[in-house]
Amino acid sequence: MSKFLTALLIIVSTNVFSWDQRPPLPVQQCSFHSPYGFAATTRQATAICREAYLVAYDAPAKIPVYVAYTLKPENALGCFPRTNAFVADNSLPPGKKASPQDYAGTGYDQGHIVPDGDQSYNQQVEWESFLMSNMSPQLPNLNRGVWKQLESSVRAWAVQRNHTLIVIPGNIYNVATNKKIGKSGVTVPDGLFKIVIDTQTNEALAFAYAQKESQPTDISLGQVSVADIERYTGITFALPKGVDKNAKPKIWAADLGALGKAKKAKCGKDD
């Protein structure tokens, strides 16, 4: 290998993986992402406040219990390119965190809980979306299928309704019995969930999807109630006053084609 090519590979590797890992912020600075109150869980969760999201991280499982973040309409059309800067979270002690190597050769994606596409309006927050404390093992068909479809739909809702959303995604799992991968013993969740709250209408949609090798990409097939997710996870969610946790409201319209055109018009590329 030429010296030039070797140097180029080193530069590329450094640019992708060696970004500025800033210390977590005080947790109360993330109350903006939980305006109705923090969700309560009986799991051994460590609250970590990042620039643009709050993660309740389960160190024994080495995956998030849940994450909460705010998605403003103007931020749903971010233009910073995807970096794939997956990296272990340096704020967590040894033995309490996952690394990209834990996923290698397992057949599972390093699956985002807070999606990169919702964080691409700022370089620092885009990088922080690739912290391994924001990942869980996800089968490719789930991560790149219906889960990705839901992520795009959430962005479309923010832009097309022109409303700020509170989004709470997370994992469904049993740390004692679920499969583990990698040297660190990363728990493979049984499924994923997402709650989306419209801060103007005080409506809440909820979805849950199982880890399956094959499933349709129709997000409506995974619609559940918030109460269902509470039963699946043991988490108690704080919602706007008057929201019925047992309800399954009509899913909001989402024009993904229009979202892609808006993204291309602003950034020169599709969603």
Predicted features along the sequence, with ranges:
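Generic hydrophobic, helix-prone segments enriched in Leu/Val/Ile
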Residues: 2, 32, 86, 154-156
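Sec-dependent signal peptide recognition
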Residues: 2-9
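N-terminal signal peptide c-region/cleavage motif recognized by signal peptidases
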Residues: 13-15
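N-terminal module-boundary/linker segments of secreted carbohydrate-active enzymes
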Residues: 17-64, 244, 250-251, 266-271
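Short, His- and charge-rich active-site/binding loops that engage polyanionic ligands
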Residues: 47-110
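Domain-level detector of nuclease and nuclease-like folds
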Residues: 90-271
